[in-house]
Swiss-Prot record:
It comes from Nicotiana tabacum. It is found in: Endoplasmic reticulum membrane. The gene is ETR1. GO terms for biological process: negative regulation of ethylene-activated signaling pathway. Induction: Constitutive expression. Not induced by senescence, wounding, application of ethephon or infection with virus. This is Ethylene receptor. Residues 157-305 form the GAF domain. Activation probably requires a transfer of a phosphate group between a His in the transmitter domain and an Asp of the receiver domain.
């Protein structure tokens, strides 16, 4: 009977068949589970690049599993249909297997390259790990550096900086010992100055020329040195297997503007030596980042030491400066006290000396106008001349005193320059004629007629210079030339610091006084401007010295921004005095405002003041008597009082002039003047008020003008001066020049 079945090709063995059946079943289960796992993990992976390969591989496995599953039914008698299914499954499996095999030819190289990339990435990851380790090490080193720098910079004391450095380095690097060797001031040795553990005596020295020291000083890097080197023998006895030792130089920065104690000389090596030791008996070694840390700290210590040294020297200089300031302040106060004492003394002496001088000159001038024998007249004239000379000397002493302490100032105003020179010439001519000396004035026409300056002081300079020329000339001539100097004639090779600058607002007056007198030794010329200087060659002769005249003149010339000098070719060859002063040029708008200089009538010497009622207020009875004698001699009706109250009580409208001493102790004479104004009201109803005083200071004059006085005259006063004062008062109602 045909059942469309295949007979088995060998006898069935039940046991073998049973094993094949079980094996095919598990193979089929395994083949079916593998694609499921592949599908699961492929879905979980979003970046897998071989999805089609997995599909083919999965189909191959599924078909292989299907063939094994079908074999479960083909191991026994089976139908033709099952055989066709089995054949179809194997054919498909063969096709898919070949396709998968062909695909693997292209895939396997990629899979191998993936492995290569994996190894590359692993190497890269390891390299990154090393770099990250270096970065972490650098960050840690930087943190240590910042920490150490902060600790080092937290103070500006050198000793604290160095101790802090050793302590912080020892703590950060776990050192057994850390030491600092400082150069001695001569720079020939290194001295152990600081240690961390204090196990060695401070002050131990080693020569600076040791090879190991030269090796360290020759580089700015930390250098490993032998533990047995002289600078590294800092461990306690009994230690063996010493740890590694490094040394680094610490620059001691050059401080050119400071002289600092304990700092090496500039000619020596300006380094300190820092030695660092790892613990003994350990296998620890110095790492690169630790050496870098040591190098950075050494540089920071160098900067901190320089700052501390500068601060230390600045504080020392400040203390020294404070001491000097205290000493200078004390000296200044003492000098001010001395100046005040001198000024007070001069003021008192001035007032006290002028009072008797007033009596001498006044009485001598009165005697001069009486009938005298020639011998008596000669004696009176000698007394009067000597008294006038003494009064001039008193004025010079006061002027010099005020010039030296800076209290004297120029009284600047507009004046007639030509008139000033003619006045000087008129004053000098009588003296020159007595000595058979011809005096003349030249070149004045090329000077401006009016100028701005201190007329009184310029006249004083001229009188001093011309007076000296006449004084030292027995006969011959004295010539005075004055010009508005040009730039080329202003310089003096002996005074290069004098460098005048021309402008439109001022000019420089150049005055030259040339005489044919005794001349001067060239070596004596610089001494002439000293106080009471004498020409040594002429010191025994009657001419004497220059007194204070030239010394005062030089200071006045300096106040006028000028220069003065003297030239002479030697003894017997005459001399030339030259001075230059700066004067202002009045503007056109100021010309109408030039002060009117009235001329006294030519016959004022013959004027009489018969019946003129005058009141004198002076506490000094002797001075009252002398002043009264002058006025009575001139014909005045004189009343004298000794106090302000008496003055106000006695004073009436009949009195035309009041002379009052403004230096009466216990009386405010300025207040008396104010009360006189109040008593008589309008100006034309009151008497003229004149201060008769021995005080020559500017304050006295300003106070007199402030309270409305009509003039100030200084003691001593002669008959001629009193006559001139009264004439000026009665004609103009004011004294134009004191």
């Amino acid at each position: 009977m045909d059942c469309n079945c295949f007979d088995p090709q060998w006898p069935a063995d039940e046991l073998l068949m049973k094993y094949q059946y079980i094996s095919d079943f598990f193979i089929a289960v395994a083949y079916f589970s593998i694609p499921i796992e592949l599908v699961y993990f492929v879905q979980k992976s979003a970046v897998f690049p071989y999805r089609w390969v997995l599909v083919q591989f999965g189909a191959f496995i599924v078909l292989c599993g299907a063939t094994h599953l079908i074999n479960l039914w083909t191991s026994t008698a089976h139908t033709r249909t099952l055989a066709i299914v089995m054949t179809t499954a194997k054919v498909l499996t063969a096709v898919v297997s070949c396709a998968t095999a062909l695909m693997l030819v292209h895939i396997i190289p990629d899979l191998l390259s993936v492995k290569t990339r994996e190894l590359f990435l692993k190497n890269k990851a390891a390299e990154l790990d090393r770099e990250m380790g270096l970065i972490r090490t650098q960050e840690e080193t930087g943190r240590y550096v910042r920490m150490l720098t902060h600790e080092i910079r937290s103070t500006l004391d050198r000793h604290t900086i160095l101790k802090t450095t050793l302590v912080e380095l020892g703590r950060t690097l776990a050192l057994e010992e850390c030491a600092l060797w400082m150069p001695t001031p001569p720079g020939l040795e290194l001295q152990l100055s600081y240690t961390l553990r204090h196990q060695n005596p401070i002050g131990f020295t080693v020569p600076i020329q040791l090879p190991v020291i030269n090796q360290v000083f020759g580089t700015n890097r930390a250098v490993k040195i032998s533990p047995n080197s002289p600078v590294a023998r800092l461990r306690p006895a009994g230690k063996y297997m010493p740890g590694e030792v490094v040394a680094v130089r610490v620059p001691l920065l050059h401080l050119s503007n400071f002289q600092i104690n304990d700092w090496p000389e500039l000619s020596t090596k300006r380094y300190a030596l820092m030695v660092l030791m790892l613990p003994s008996g350990s296998a620890r070694q110095w790492h690169v980042h630790e050496l870098e840390l040591v190098e950075v700290v050494a540089d920071q210590v160098a900067v901190a030491l320089s700052h501390a040294a500068i601060l230390e020297e600045s504080m020392r200089a400040r203390d020294l400066l404070m001491e000097q300031n205290v000493a200078l302040d004390l000296a200044r106060r003492e000098a001010e006290m001395a100046v005040r004492a001198r000024n007070d003394f001069l003021a008192v002496m001035n007032h006290e000396m002028r009072t008797p001088m007033h009596a001498i000159i006044a009485l001598s001038s009165l005697l001069q106008e009486t009938e005298l024998t020639p011998e008596q007249r000669l004696m009176v004239e000698t007394i009067l001349k000597s008294s006038n000379l003494l009064a001039t000397l008193i004025n010079d002493v006061l002027d010099l005193s005020r010039l030296e302490d800076g209290s004297l100032q120029l009284d600047v105003g507009t004046f007639n320059l030509h008139v000033l020179f003619r006045k000087v010439l008129n004053l000098i001519k009588p003296i020159a004629s007595v000595k058979n000396c011809l005096s003349r004035l030249t070149c004045l026409q090329i000077c401006p007629e009016f100028a701005i300056g201190d007329e009184k002081r310029l006249m004083q300079i001229l009188l001093n210079v011309v007076g000296n020329a006449v004084k030292f000339s027995k006969e011959g001539s004295v010539s005075i030339s004055a010009v508005a100097a040009k730039s080329e004639s202003l310089s003096d090779p002996r005074a290069p610091e004098f460098f005048p600058v021309q402008s439109e607002n001022h000019f420089y007056l150049r005055v030259q006084v040339k005489d044919t007198g005794s001349g001067i030794n060239p070596q004596d010329i610089p001494k002439l401007f000293c106080k009471f200087a004498q020409n040594q060659a002429l010191a025994t002769k009657s001419s004497g010295g220059t007194g204070l005249g030239l010394a005062i003149s030089k200071r006045f010339v300096n106040l006028m921004e000028g220069h003065i000098w003297i030239e002479s070719e030697g003894l017997g060859k005459g001399s030339t005095a030259i001075f230059i002063v700066k004067l202002g040029i009045p503007g056109r708008s100021n010309e109408p405002k030039l002060p009117f200089m009235p001329r006294l009538p030519a016959n004022h010497m013959q004027m009489t003041f018969q019946g003129l009622k005058v009141l004198i207020m002076d506490d000094n009875g002797f001075s009252r008597m002398v002043t009264k004698g002058l006025l009575v001699h001139l014909g005045c009706d004189v009343t004298t009082v000794s106090s302000g109250d008496e003055c106000l009580r006695v004073l009436t409208q009949e009195h035309k002039v009041v002379f009052m001493d403004v230096s009466i102790p216990g009386i405010d004479c300025y207040e008396v003047a104010v009360q006189i104004h109040e008593k008589f009201g309008k100006h034309h109803n009151r008497p003229l008020i004149v201060a008769l005083t021995g005080n020559t200071d500017r304050v006295t004059k300003e106070n007199c003008m402030r309270v409305g006085m009509d003039g100030v005259i200084l003691k001593p006063v002669s008959v001629d001066k009193m006559r001139s004062v009264l004439s000026e008062l009665l004609e103009h109602g004011v004294i134009l020049q004191s």
